[in-house]
Amino acid sequence: IGLVGSEMCIRDSCLIMDKVKDDIDKALFYVHQTVENGWSRSMLLNFISTDLYERQGKALTNFTKTLPDAMSDLAQELTKDPYNFAFTGITGRYNERLLKNALLNNITRFLIELGTGFAYVGKEYRLEIGETENFIDLLFYNLSLSCYVVVEVKIGKFAFADIGQLGGYVVACNHLLRKEGRDNPTIGLLICKEKDRIQAQYALESSSQPLGISEYDLEKFYPEKVEGTMPTIEEIEAKLRDN
């Protein structure tokens, strides 16, 4: 098996080739992600079934204008759109409190969905700004980026006001939590049920803080099955050598 088998088990290689048909680039994506992140077989199967290849790095952001080049590329890569929250088990009507509680009741799966390096800091995290108490929905620290990540969850459609609130929290974290020499600039991520892409892009352009906007989905979704011949071990190895 050569290059593939030397870093991941044959069973996982076969799983990728069985599930990802006629798309060498997609197969290589899952190979690289499995090796780099040490995914278990169940995690690999989950990310294939929820089509991570098509979702990763797809959030609308202003990172290229607000972060150093090296950090902006990695920050973008760590985003998803949409985020798959089917693991919450929520069906029917719900409110933001129910969704946030369901995310934290499944914190391990939530962290896996957020991506590499995310560590949970707190829910309704209190920030005293001047004489006012403010509460961040969810606060994380990303070890890969060495920065705090403010996550706001909205069950409705994106609104301009959401960016103003998120940007304010990001600035506050930089003043109150960030340590010079240890932490990179704080990033904000808004995860909403629906967004108008043009409106979201305009809102991002209006902010000087590094922010991203993504949607979430509560339903299980699977990649469209592609008919054709699956890539062979030799084809994958050849592509790896080319890269």
Can you annotate each of these PLM segments?
Residues 103, 136-140, 147-155, 168-171, ...:
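Conserved catalytic cores of phosphodiester-cleaving nucleases, focusing on short active-site segments
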Residues 29-36:
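Short, small/acidic-rich helices and loops at N termini and domain boundaries
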Residues 53-93:
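Interdomain/boundary linker segments immediately adjacent to catalytic/signaling cores
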Residues 1-5, 9-10:
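Single conserved hydrophobic/aromatic residue that forms the stacking wall/gate
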Residues 154-155, 159-162, 173-206:
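Nucleic-acid nuclease catalytic cores
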Residues 116-144:
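Active-site metal-binding core of divalent-cation-utilizing nuclease and nuclease-like domains
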Residues 91-122:
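Acidic-basic catalytic patches of nuclease active cores, encompassing PD-(D/E)XK
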Residues 202-243:
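Polybasic (Lys/Arg-rich)
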